[in-house]
Every structure is written in structure tokens, then in C-alpha cells.
């Protein structure tokens, strides 16, 4: 039933979009590219409510010197990708999503903690819901035009595997992995398909980074080694995603030359840095700068975390997210090849 409902919605949206685009103007040269972002804390630049941890110290201490809603000490993936593409930083859905006038920048729909499925704990809109926000802006409210604005714009779907954490804890048997991974990737593919109907110039989707190397996992080894028990699931996800993206590119009816969908290989970039093979060498790459319950206080107002002396010396900021320097290193590795793939 779940699959049929999604299929019905996909077909309805597909025909709705193609009926609407005829009234739009032809695509213009991409002189001022817009960037549209969907995902979670790796891409969020301030969509969470002011009560979220991302709005509390020590988040933001490197940039802008105070909490900005980013899950880092400073800039995150969205900031670095926008710079590489020559695009202005996207507006936030939280502050601009209800405006009724045409906007001259893209928009960031990413929320910290967002998953493929609805979280029973976090109220963040899931990824397909975020894509639905843009569909509403483009079709119902005409804030963005499809053949005009979106056809000359770039999109990023950032997925950091939040759905997998609880699943792994409850299912230590690997036999359950393939079916769950297929379900996750199917949902990501569904969202990418809707984005394809919106005619973005190019669409980037992140590979799954090494979950077993995140501080929330490596704390068990005092941040000395990754937990390889996560490797098979990550490998299954990335192999399945690669097939899904290849299928989308093959079946793309709107693109006559080149591939619209590009995989941002976060896994390779993370591993290069964690294995100390990149240009930037972090002394203890598995250890976070903000160690413990970052940004939280106990009942007496004492910090429940400790902070490193220099965030630039750390790859990870907290138990999940990289530091600004970490993201800089990642996008330095992704660099020119990613930019060329997205702008061709």
C-alpha cells in the first residue's frame, strides 16, 4: 500500500508539473545560479527552532562567533558547495518559506535530525516532505518558475544515515540489512525523481559516509578505531544508491546530453581524511572537539561537555558533525571534479 500511494503521488505530480511548465519562459543562461538544499544537519544552515542545540553555545564559535543554527563550530557543507558553484547562500525555509514574492536565491529546506522516515523523537520534516515544500513554492505559489529558475539551478540532497542508527541497534543480524537498505534508497530515489520533474540543471546526492567512524560510535574505543560492523550496511547503501542514480540518469526524459544526477562521494572523502591521506592531517581525527553532551548543561548549570583548545585541529565537531575545518577539508578533496560534474 505504501508503495502504491507513493507511485500514485509520483505520477500525479509528474503530469501536474508537465502541464504547468508550458507557461514558463525558456531557460536562461546560468549567470546567477541558485542552490536548493534538502537533508539534515550536514546541510542545515539554520532551519531548526531557536530551542535546538544548534542555536546554543559552543555551536558557531568559529563562525560567526555565536550560534547560527549550524551543527558545527562554523560553516557546513552547504556553505562550501555554494561557494564552489558561485551561488549565493540559499535562503532558509524557516525565514523565507512563507513569502509570496519571487526570490533571487535558492532555498535551504534541510533540518537537523531529518530522516527518510518520520522520527518518533525529532519533529524535523523528513526529506520527501522537504521536497514537497519546494513543489508547493514552484507549482502552487509560483515563487520559483520551473523552466526559468529551477532549470538553471542546482540541488543537493544530503543524507547522513540517521535512520540506520536505531535499526542497527535493534537488528544485529546482517540478514535484515538488505531489505531495510532497499527501503531507504527507494525513498531517496523517489525524492530524486520528484526533483527531476522540477527540471533542475543538476542534482547532487551524497553517498553514505562511514557510520562506524563517527564519534558517537568510536567513543567505545576511546576514539582510537572505527567499528567495522557498520561497514557492510554502508557498502550496501552506497551500492544501491549508485544503481538508483544510474537508473534515474538512464530514464531521464528531460536531459538529452550528460547526466543530471551526480553522487557526492562523502564516503571516499571521509576515509581519505580519517586515514590521514589528505592534504590536511588531523592528529586525532576520530575524536570530536566538543566531547560529551555538546551544548547541554546539567541542573546546576555546569557544562556536560568539554571543548578542545582549537577547533581547527579537529575533524569532528560533535558526535556526528564535522568542524568547519573538517568540511573545508572534505570539499577541498571533492573540489574541481565535483564542480565540473555539476556545472557541465
Curated annotation (Swiss-Prot):
GO terms for cellular component: extracellular region. The keyword Kinase does not apply. GO terms for molecular function: hydrolase activity, acting on ester bonds. Keywords: Glycoprotein, Hydrolase, Lipid degradation, Lipid metabolism, Secreted, Signal. The active site is at 41 (nucleophile), 318. Glycans are attached at residues 126, 227, 238. Its EC number is 3.1.1.-. It is an enzyme of class 3 (hydrolase). Belongs to the 'GDSL' lipolytic enzyme family. This is GDSL esterase/lipase At5g03590. It comes from Arabidopsis thaliana.
